[in-house]
From Swiss-Prot:
Residue list for modification Phosphoserine: S122, S231, S239, S387
Domain RRM: 4-80, 114-191, 325-409, 477-582
Organism: Mus musculus
Modified residues (N-acetylalanine): A2
Compositionally biased residues, Basic residues: 679-698
Protein name as it appears in the record: RNA-binding protein 28
InterPro entries (UniProt xref): Nucleotide-bd_a/b_plait_sf (IPR012677), RBD_domain_sf (IPR035979), RRM_dom (IPR000504), RRM_MRD1_RNA_proc_ribogen (IPR051945)
Stored CDD domains: RRM1_RBM28_like, RRM2_RBM28_like, RRM3_RBM28_like, RRM4_RBM28_like
Gene: Rbm28
RNA-binding listed as a keyword: yes
Glycyl lysine isopeptide (Lys-Gly) (interchain with G-Cter in SUMO2) crosslink location in chain: K643
Length: 750
């Protein structure tokens, strides 16, 4: 409980624990309170500790409490937390002893881990030279160059760093580098017993048993230098190369970890580290814990070499997994310590133990841990708080999101490890065609206008007809929105869609376009909206959440004009043609010399973006449907909600294949059982005209249209003829000046 314990200093010798508790209980409930006394007396040593249950009480105590019985006192947040021990030991023991002992134990373990072996070392190199080289990577605590009894060097050395991170940097930086004219090999130093095991494994004809353990548990922390110093002393000066080969046998099987944790030694006995080798299950999301067993007793039991290996395997260890109190933590930082993890978990209840899983060879953290609570309720609280749907977004430690699951037995963990998670292989995503489906007669259809229901039925019929073509697939990220008001533009629609996904993080809309009528539109004028639009999201989860919130929502545009939202249908062939067209245009742009370089760069950037959009659309069909958040938009009007379930179908030949989730089996209005006997009054419809009547009407219309056309043509020709006659008259007889032409007499009448 970091930050919940206060250190109270400058207390008078007469101070008692009950007085201190009475003072601090005025601020809030005190979980623990005691003063540190002198040995053999009740006189206070001048300081004490107070632990609260809530952080708010700690802040109040720091501000309000400044005196104790008239004396001024110092109240600060305690730096170190006392270990969980019984109440009697807390009251009687000295407060400094529980701090010093764990530090001493941890320091030893850390020292042994952050130790490197340097092989192929030059005889001219001294300890000071080595220290000067490795000081660049961190604090060097010790440099040891083993020597023979006659004082000659053996050709290798050990370098001890302060922590594991610095040792890892030195291993990366100094490996295969020259020191005093000789290329050195740097690796992790390994314990003596593991060195022996590696030697036996590398020897020909010797089979290494998996259950082999050291005979004496007290020799576990010994290092390779002990084995090397016990080797034959009658070797020559140039025999250090052979020694390097012996050392390399232990360096090869060791996997290098960047970081590790310091392993605490809790009083409760826990199983040996090598029992957790297969515990980190990445895909199964589960874990196992084989119970609590005393490590020393297990090591002593294995000293008996007469017991066959088969009997050892059959021996079942006691397990506490069935109690439901043990949890398995994954995604743990390699720097996280058991004490810090315990402080995070202790807010849910008292802990029995916390154990970080270490690698059996390097003794570095594997990034996972086990923790057992005293009660099952505390474990359930921890699981609930660790879920991503919790208020705080789960549990975090050292900047990493912790994944917490209930521990399972070793057998169940083996089954989970071998069990393959079958991923859906469908490429058309037909199951998404059902998303948002609303049938007449369902609860979601209540209050929907008849015009909207007619539109939905028409769109559903068109969707079924299009999906009969194998080249058409349902997009996972692109939405098609119908029944939009004419006044809605791109910006307003984008804003509404972002509001629909306000609970999600990192929502990005790649495209949001309202389709418009572009006929007869010139300049900057926008055409009239066609009442539908397309919106493409970056992630399927965000598109699904927006659909479930937006579809049939009466609060957006009113109950009489509800939006109709569905996943868009894409044509694989058209997307390929579009991609080829973009590639051709890019090639043309590259081939043409452009004077203005910035404009060219801008165009290329724009084309690259378009190409990425098209590629993402084409790859969309092959993506496996992701996990959907069922809580998104779970309202009465949102319509049918799909689940990306993977079902198996057994074929006649005995083989199994994935069941393809097809389109909805039921269409049209839903007729409930209670309404089956009732006769519904259908709206009166006009009788459809017969085929003969239709033909007669068409002929009449055609004849009525053709008659005026013929008359118009005849009138035109007659007018043209009259015009020509008039022109000839004017040429022959002269222009008429408004007076009627006089009839001229013939020549023979004179």
């Amino acid at each position: 409980m970091a930050g919940l314990t206060l250190f109270v200093g400058r207390l008078p010798p007469s101070a008692r624990s009950d007085q201190l508790e009475e003072l601090f209980s005025q601020v809030g409930p005190v979980k623990q309170c005691f003063v540190v006394t002198e040995k053999g007396s009740k006189a206070c040593r001048g300081f004490g500790y107070v632990t609260f249950s809530m952080l708010e009480d700690v802040q109040r105590a720091l501000k309000e409490i400044t005196t104790f019985e008239g004396c001024k006192i110092d109240v600060t947040v305690a730096k170190k937390k006392l270990r969980n021990k019984s109440k009697e030991t807390r009251k009687n023991e000295n407060a400094e002893s529980p701090k010093k002992e764990p530090k001493h134990k941890k320091a030893k373990v850390a020292d042994k881990k952050a130790r490197l072996i340097i092989r192929n070392l030059s005889f001219k190199c001294s300890e000071d030279d080595l220290k000067a080289v490795f000081t660049h990577y961190g604090t060097v605590l010790e440099v040891n160059i083993p020597k023979k009894p006659d004082g000659k060097m053996r050709g290798f050395a050990f370098v001890q760093f302060k922590n594991l991170l610095e040792a890892g940097k030195a291993l990366k930086g100094a490996n295969m580098k020259e020191i005093k004219g000789r290329t050195v090999a740097v690796d992790w130093a390994v314990a003596k017993d593991k060195y022996k095991d590696a030697q036996h494994a590398s020897a020909p004809g010797v089979k290494k048993s998996s259950d082999r353990k050291p005979k004496e548990s007290g020799k576990k922390n010994c290092r390779v230098e002990e084995q090397v110093e016990d080797s034959d002393d009658e070797e020559d000066d140039d025999s250090h190369d052979d020694e390097e080969e012996r050392e390399s046998t232990i360096a090869s099987p060791v996997s290098v970890h960047k970081r590790a944790v310091k392993r605490a030694a809790p009083e409760e006995s826990i199983e040996e580290d090598d029992s957790y080798e297969d515990s980190d299950l990445e895909e199964g999301g589960s874990s196992y814990d084989e119970g609590t067993v005393d490590s020393e007793s297990s090591a002593e039991d294995q000293e008996d070499e007469d017991v066959p290996v088969s009997e050892k395997k059959k021996r079942k260890l006691p397990s506490d997994v069935t109690e439901g109190k043990t949890v398995f933590i994954r995604n743990l930082s390699f720097d996280s310590e058991e004490e810090a993890l315990g402080e995070v978990l202790q807010q849910f209840g008292d802990l029995k133990y916390v154990r970080v899983v270490l690698h059996p060879d390097t003794e570095h953290s594997k990034g996972c841990a086990f923790a057992q609570f005293m009660t099952q309720e505390a474990a359930q609280k921890c699981l609930a708080a660790a879920s991503l749907e919790a208020e705080g977004g789960g549990l975090k430690l050292d900047g990493r999101q912790l994944k917490v699951d209930l521990a399972v037995t070793r057998d169940e963990a083996a089954k989970l490890q071998t069990k393959k998670v079958k991923k859906p292989t469908g490429t058309r995503n037909l199951y998404l065609a059902r998303e948002g489906l609303i049938r007449a007669g369902t609860k979601a259809a209540e209050g929907v206008s008849a015009a909207d229901m007619a539109k939905r039925e028409r769109f559903e019929l068109l969707k079924h007809q299009k999906l009969k073509n194998q080249n058409i697939f349902v997009s996972q990220t692109r939405l098609c929105l119908h029944n939009l008001p004419k006044a809605v533009d791109d910006k307003q629609l984008r804003k509404l869609l972002l509001e629909a996904t306000r609970g999600e993080k990192g929502v990005r809309i790649k495209e949001c376009r309202v389709m418009r009528d572009l006929k007869g539109v010139h300049g900057k004028m926008k055409g009239q909206s066609l009442g539908y639009a397309f919106a493409e999201f970056q992630k399927h989860e965000h598109a699904l959440r927006a659909l479930r919130h937006f579809n049939n929502n009466p609060e957006i545009f009113g109950s009489q004009k509800r939006p109709i939202v569905e996943f868009s249908l894409e044509d694989r062939r058209k997307l390929k043609v579009k991609e080829l067209r973009i590639q051709r245009s890019l090639q043309k742009m590259e081939s043409k010399p452009v004077t203005s370089k910035p404009q060219k760069e801008q165009k290329e950037v724009g084309k690259d973006k378009q190409q990425k959009v098209v590629q993402s659309a084409t790859q969309d069909q092959s993506k496996a449907p992701g996990e959907q958040k069922g809580k998104a938009g779970s309202t009465s009007w949102s319509g049918f909600q799909t689940k990306a379930e993977v079902e198996q179908v057994e074929l006649p030949d005995g083989k199994k294949r994935r069941k393809v989730l097809a389109l909805p089996s039921h269409r049209g209005p839903k007729i409930r059982l209670r309404d089956k006997g009732k006769v519904k009054s259908l709206p009166s419809r006009k009788p459809k005209p017969q085929m003969g009547q239709r033909k007669q009407k068409k002929q009449q219309l055609a004849s009525s249209v053709q008659a005026p056309k013929r008359k118009a043509k005849e009138n035109k020709a007659e007018a043209r003829f009259n015009q020509l006659v008039e022109q000839y008259k004017q040429k022959l007889l002269g222009p008429s000046k408004g007076a009627p032409l006089m009839k001229r007499s013939k020549w023979f009448d004179s």
